């Protein structure tokens, strides 16, 4: 599911995960069929794995150990 862009400039540390999370929410049945907002669908538990990956990426930006290990995410 991750998308890798060679020609696209860097948009930040967690830009790839954030973009994939947004695409997952917009393509979910919750948004398309039920007509709910992506925020409501995220609270209901859709795209949970990407939400957790985005959280881990953001948390690794604040972690001092990430200097040695590198940031999580793509």
Swiss-Prot record:
User: What InterPro entries does UniProt report for this protein, alphabetically?
Assistant: Cyt_c_oxidase_assmbl_Pet191 (IPR018793)
Its family? Belongs to the PET191 family.
Disulfide bond recorded as keyword:
yes
Kindly list the cysteine pairs connected by disulfide bridges. 30-57, 41-47
Where would I find the CHCH domain in this sequence? Answer: 27-65
UniProtKB keywords: Disulfide bond, Phosphoprotein
Q: Mind telling me what this protein is named?
A: Cytochrome c oxidase assembly factor 5
> Where is the signal peptide, in residue numbers?
none
What organism is the protein native to?
Answer: Mus musculus
Keyword Transferase listed? The answer is no
What biological processes does GO assign it? leukocyte differentiation; multicellular organism growth; spleen development; thymus development
At which positions is motif Cx9C motif? 47-57
Report motif location: Cx10C motif.
30-41
This molecule's function is given as: Involved in an early step of the mitochondrial complex IV assembly process.
Which residues are reported to carry the modification Phosphoserine?
A: 37
């Amino acid at each position: 599911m991750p998308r890798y862009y060679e020609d696209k400039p860097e948009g930040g540390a967690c830009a790839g995960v954030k973009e994939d999370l947004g695409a997952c929410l917009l393509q979910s049945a919750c948004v398309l069929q039920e007509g709910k907002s992506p925020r409501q669908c995220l609270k209901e538990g859709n795209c949970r794995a990407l939400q957790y990956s985005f959280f881990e990426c953001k948390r690794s930006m604040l972690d001092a150990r990430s200097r040695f290990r590198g940031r999580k995410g793509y």
